């Protein structure tokens, strides 16, 4: 018990000593602050100097604010520029790439065509084929010209029906002239017989002429057919 009482009394004594030391320090600091306030001179400023100091402080604060905000403003402008111009640049690059591919394709086509032309010029069969084609075209033109001439000549010549009709008209005129030249006489048997004979002869001559003209026309048609067949055969042989 005695030991416990001693320890409790010791602790109380230490706590009281601590409080007393803290109070002494606070008193010393307070007295020191009062002494410093008494030693400081009192500042007295004019209105003009106060305005100048206020303006300078505002300018300094605005300058500091501007300097602090410059990086953010610069980044904003950079981002805006990128946002506006990057899509355009991407489209231009795509177009350039597509045009480059097209140019490459065209260049390959040109290379292939020049190579094929060189090979064609080296091969002689193509030149032979072209010469044969030219010859066949010339012969076909000649045949067309010949046929056109034959067609024109056939149109210039009178047709068979017109020939027969004209010959019939001529014979009829001759017959009428013969009838008008005959003098009227008494009907006798001899005169009747002679008239009949003349009429029969005229009719026979007329028929013979018509037959001759028809034979000539048939011969001309046969000749034209033979010439056409020969021309067609020659053309087929040359083409083959």
From Swiss-Prot:
Keywords: Coiled coil, Lysosome, Membrane
Coiled-coil regions, chain positions: 211-239
Comp. bias (Low complexity): 7-26, 163-179, 196-205
Keyword Membrane found: yes
Cellular location(s): Lysosome membrane
Region (Disordered), start-end ranges: 1-33, 163-240
Family: Belongs to the BORCS8 family.
Stretches with biased composition (Polar residues): 180-190
UniProt keyword annotation of Coiled coil present: yes
Protein name according to UniProt: BLOC-1-related complex subunit 8 homolog
Gene Ontology cellular component annotations, sorted alphabetically: BORC complex; lysosomal membrane
InterPro entries found in the cross-reference section: BORCS8
Function noted in UniProt: May participate in the coupling of lysosomes to microtubule plus-end-directed kinesin motor.
A Pfam family hit: BORCS8
Lineage: Eukaryota, Amoebozoa, Evosea, Eumycetozoa, Dictyostelia
């Amino acid at each position: 018990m005695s030991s416990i009482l001693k320890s409790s009394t010791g602790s109380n004594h230490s706590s009281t000593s601590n409080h007393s030391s803290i109070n002494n320090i606070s008193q010393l600091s307070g007295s020191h602050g009062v002494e410093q306030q008494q030693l400081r001179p009192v500042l007295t400023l004019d209105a003009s100097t106060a305005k100048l100091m206020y303006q300078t402080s505002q300018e300094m604060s605005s300058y500091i604010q501007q300097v602090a905000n410059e990086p953010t403003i610069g980044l904003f402008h950079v981002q805006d520029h990128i946002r506006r111009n990057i899509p355009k640049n991407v489209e231009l690059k795509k177009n350039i790439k597509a045009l480059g591919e097209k140019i490459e394709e065209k260049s390959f086509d040109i290379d292939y065509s020049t190579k094929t032309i060189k090979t064609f010029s080296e091969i002689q069969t193509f030149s032979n084929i072209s010469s044969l084609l030219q010859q066949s075209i010339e012969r076909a033109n000649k045949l067309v010209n010949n046929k056109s001439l034959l067609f024109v000549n056939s149109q210039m010549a009178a047709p068979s029906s017109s020939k027969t009709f004209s010959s019939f008209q001529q014979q009829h005129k001759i017959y009428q002239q013969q009838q008008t030249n005959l003098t009227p006489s008494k009907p006798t048997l001899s005169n009747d017989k002679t008239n009949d004979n003349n009429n029969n002869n005229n009719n026979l001559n007329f028929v013979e002429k018509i037959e001759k003209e028809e034979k000539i026309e048939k011969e001309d048609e046969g000749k034209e057919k033979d010439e056409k067949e020969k021309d067609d055969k020659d053309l087929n042989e040359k083409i083959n």
